[in-house]
């Protein structure tokens, strides 16, 4: 087996750079390109605060979201009585009344009939039962009397 | 055969001024090269920049060499380890062995490995020392236990690994591991581990620790 010690191999090292059997420039270019891509990725990573474009998960709330409520105004008079003043509510009431007036504006309302029993033999409304009731029963004597009058 | 023996042999063959020039007589226009014991291939693992790239896309042979002079020419023309991007690997493997566990020459082997947290300049020097020890065969046993050597560049650390063809020859593996520690300039407090490829990826268990 041919062996070379480290010193012997260093002794055989040419002082000048020698040509190689492969495209060293292309190899170096690939490595440089990879380094550039990695640098860009790292820059993007740092720009986003140490994480990539993660979508915000639905589990990011660790509690109920904070809703700011205005504190009610309480005034205390000279006798020591505290009075709750819902000043904002008054304004709201006015707004509500305006809303109500708007809601009263007449509109063309489409009445949707209840078709639930439309194919049934049962009347849809009890009033219909009364209306359909036969109000005049047949009177045979009355009918005979009328025939006699006609003959005379 | 040492380099001096090879040189002496060449000089003894030479009888006149027309004798072939070696790197020792003319470092740029030499005609005779110093042969290595084996043909070696330099492989490079490119870091993945696209999710579609597979391992086979990333691992590519760069070039091969069979002489000391060819080796130096390659070393002078490729980036040094500290110039490599993160997640790069250099592999130098014997003959046509692929630097993969699946290669038949590696399937029954294992590797000595050591992680170094060190300055980039030190990594360059240690990688060169490891290469010289491997291609010069001074780290190997007479029955040739070594298949190749790998350098993995990672963030904040570099991993040196020496791949062997067998995982059961404890005496030979211990000798190789001891020399590997010397090449990497490790002290007694530094521990290197030998892990068979068969256990890698499942339950990694070192069989020898030095």
UniProtKB/Swiss-Prot annotation, chain A:
Alphabetized GO MF terms: eukaryotic initiation factor 4E binding; translation initiation factor activity
Biased composition (Basic residues): 51-72
Composition-biased stretches (Basic and acidic residues): 124-133
Location within or outside the cell: Cytoplasm
Listed GO biological process terms: filamentous growth; negative regulation of translation; positive regulation of cytoplasmic mRNA processing body assembly; positive regulation of translation
Biased composition, class Polar residues, residue ranges: 114-123
Sequence similarity: Belongs to the CAF20 family.
Function recorded in the entry: Acts as an inhibitor of cap-dependent translation. Competes with eIF4G1 and EAP1 for binding to eIF4E and interferes with the formation of the eIF4F complex, inhibiting translation and stabilizing mRNA.
This protein's name: Cap-associated protein CAF20
Organism: Vanderwaltozyma polyspora (strain ATCC 22028 / DSM 70294 / BCRC 21397 / CBS 2163 / NBRC 10782 / NRRL Y-8283 / UCD 57-17) (Kluyveromyces polysporus)
Gene: CAF20
């Amino acid at each position: 087996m041919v062996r070379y010690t480290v010193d012997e191999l260093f002794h055989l090292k040419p002082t000048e750079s020698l040509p190689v059997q492969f495209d060293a420039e292309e190899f170096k270019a690939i490595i440089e390109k990879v380094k550039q891509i990695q640098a860009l990725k790292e820059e993007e990573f740092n720009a986003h605060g140490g994480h990539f474009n993660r979508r915000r998960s639905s589990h990011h709330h660790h509690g109920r979201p904070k809703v700011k409520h205005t504190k009610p105004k309480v005034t205390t008079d000279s006798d020591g009585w505290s009075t709750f003043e819902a000043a904002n509510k008054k304004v709201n009431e006015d707004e509500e009344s305006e809303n109500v007036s708007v809601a009263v504006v007449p509109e063309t309302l489409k009445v949707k009939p209840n078709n639930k029993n439309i194919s049934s033999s049962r009347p849809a409304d009890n009033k219909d039962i009364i209306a359909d009731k036969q109000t005049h029963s047949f009177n045979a004597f009355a009918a005979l009397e009328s025939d006699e009058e006609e003959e005379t | 055969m040492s380099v001096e023996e090879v040189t002496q042999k060449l000089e003894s063959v030479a009888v006149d001024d027309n004798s072939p020039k070696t790197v020792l007589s003319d470092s740029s226009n030499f005609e005779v090269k110093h042969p290595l014991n084996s043909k070696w291939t330099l492989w490079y693992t490119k870091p993945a920049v696209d999710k579609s790239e597979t391992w086979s896309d990333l691992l590519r042979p760069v070039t091969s060499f069979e002489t000391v002079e060819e080796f130096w020419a390659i070393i002078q023309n490729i980036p040094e380890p500290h110039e490599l991007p993160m997640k790069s690997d250099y592999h130098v493997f014997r003959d046509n062995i692929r630097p993969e566990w699946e290669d038949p020459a590696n399937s029954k082997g294992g590797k000595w490995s050591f992680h170094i947290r060190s300055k980039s300049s030190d990594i360059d020097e240690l990688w060169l020392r490891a290469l010289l020890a491997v291609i010069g065969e001074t780290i190997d046993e007479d029955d040739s236990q070594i298949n190749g050597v790998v350098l993995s560049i990672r963030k904040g650390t570099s991993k040196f690994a020496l791949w062997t063809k067998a995982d059961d020859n404890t005496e030979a593996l211990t000798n190789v591991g001891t020399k590997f520690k010397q090449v990497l300039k490790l002290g007694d407090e530094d521990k290197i581990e030998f892990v068979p490829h068969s256990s890698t990826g499942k339950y990694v268990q070192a069989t020898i620790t030095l």
